[in-house]
Amino acid sequence: FGSGAYAVYPGNNIKEHLQPFTEGALKLNGPTKMAAAVMPYYTISTGEGENVANGYNKYLITDVLRGTSGYEGVLCTDWGITKDITSVYKFEGKPFGVENLSEAERHYKAIQAGMDQFGGNNDMAPVLEAYKLGVAEMGEEGMRARFEESAVRLLTNIFRTGLFENPYLDVEQTTQIVGNSEFMKAGFDAQLRSVIMLKNSDKSLPLATKQKVYVPQRYMAPTTNWWGVTTEPKTVDAFNMEVVSNYFEIVETPGEADFALVGIQSPDGGVVYDASDLEKGGNGYVPINLQYGTYTAETASEVIIAGGSPLEDFTNRSYKGKSVTTINTTDMQLV
């Protein structure tokens, strides 16, 4: 989201943030020696070269990643960074720092920075326009050489996987792998081992099969998710009831049951932004709620200078005194 366009590095500790790349992805034991492709991330790395999203930052891409670290693989932009954005809270494009450029100019700037591929763009038109911009600046020969440089990196990965030498599917081999009962059992066993039992002091588990079980439904309040989609209030089954019926006898009331099977989710406090708050004269920012029920930010800072988006005319994003109620607050009532 545009509300989180900036990354800051207190204490000038940018080197620590680079370690996953320099000590991890760029130093692998496999035959490629480094990750085949890398995404640089959406944010503006404040103070590290030009204050633009990493995919447009020539200092980070060409000087640091390509130069200092010697990275030779594909660099793909994060999803949708060349698209337009109209609001800090809508899930749209992420052209952070280059909002004033056209879509074609953004593509060209990313190419100049050293990017090879555009994530989330299936339209060749702005890429071709970017090519024309490059020809006007560096000539046909220079821009073609730049495109071929990226083409070599992209095609190298395709050749490495054998997609040119043998692009055909071996049906016999596929039928032995897809839906393989041994593989499915291994996957199911792994899921069982991943389940964490917090307590079983009275030895209630495991349960005998075919006991009577009460399974309450979950109520979901109306909300707007991070895609901007508004959902209506609804009551849903917490589990696949057909599967539950294979093991237990499902009853309609708690009084009929030997035990209850209650499914809940972690508190869902929304997306920390409320358009209705903005409409009422607020700044739109609301607190994160990590508890069931209502949380009021009584002790938050009066001033939070985290603004800077060209889509906002203020810098103070404080949400002190504002309240947020979790969407699934009734989950705790079920328990």
Language model segments and positions:
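Glycoside hydrolase catalytic-domain context in secreted enzymes
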Residues: 1-335
